[in-house]
């Protein structure tokens, strides 16, 4: 999840102003002078003396909103009736609800959907648990599980504050892929307790999406759940980012005419997303990846307390380079940032190989300002929606879960992730591909179905799909 910005800072100001004292042009001028942009005007009421209007204003941030309101307060004859943040209005009462698929209008309806008729369905599932997939919501339902410890851009804000993010995630599952998802925010940071809770609720779900759980706990939680459950478990902060990154890189390399096996990649931020990005790149065929964290390049001559870094050192940096980001980036074809704002300098970009590719994905502020980097890079991507080539997990998780659910996959394996990345990349045609369009829009209607199909094929190919014809049971007339 990215921090709010842009259109998310729209506010609606209800103003009452006296016609004989002030004109609307005075109001518009004050808003513009304070830095606001009027995007909508609605007349609520009008009389000989007063006019009441709702003015929707776009602002950069909350400070600018305050400046706009203060400017309006200073205008004689203007009264501020109310100020509404449109983003907050969308969240009142939560963003999702449960709907019934079958109307219950008669006693007969009631007896079939609940007692006594439901007992026959329960018995059928007890006799053959596979029928849970055909007779309950399990086959199309995903749990979005978080403890609120690593909400991107906000950090450890806890389970209550994480709920709006998880509700939003559930909405996107439904809107983009028709998957019913439910947010589950846990009031515990204990790794073992989280594992046991998720295992206990798993019978109701066809998949588990782990979200915004801090590293290194997220690695152990996902690993254990994948081992102990027979449904897909997917930590989106790791693998969703990795899949979309690879999709973008595949297309970027076409533009610069380079191959995965020949490139040098420097990656900053060896946390959950950084490690997952590295692993998918290695699986795709990249041979030379150098991971850099705050202490410099990860190399084999160092003993790290973090066991994941120790493993990382064995898998990467074939030349065992040492030093800072600035030291190791010389000659790099690709920079990938999942770290912190402003750590990549223009001087670093100048040291890179010809036609450098930069994925600066820190949110809300990338590792380098795209406008500063633009003269020196061939392809630039960020995690932001206000620049071209946004690396957005929404391109991945709806389609990858849609495919996994449709074939009843036991897991989402590396081959399925690779297939998803290639499918996303394929949505951008050869005619469309250019430096500012290496990745499709999240609203491209082809994405989910293309990913779904590729994931299903990979699941069958690797033997993790279990879709078969399960008899529903009950009287069939035969």
UniProtKB/Swiss-Prot annotation:
The active site is at residues 114, 169. Keywords: Metal-binding, NAD, Oxidoreductase. GO terms for molecular function: malate dehydrogenase (decarboxylating) (NAD+) activity; metal ion binding; NAD binding; oxaloacetate decarboxylase activity. This enzyme has a higher affinity for NAD than for NADP. Homotetramer. Belongs to the malic enzymes family. This is NAD-dependent malic enzyme. It comes from Geobacillus stearothermophilus.
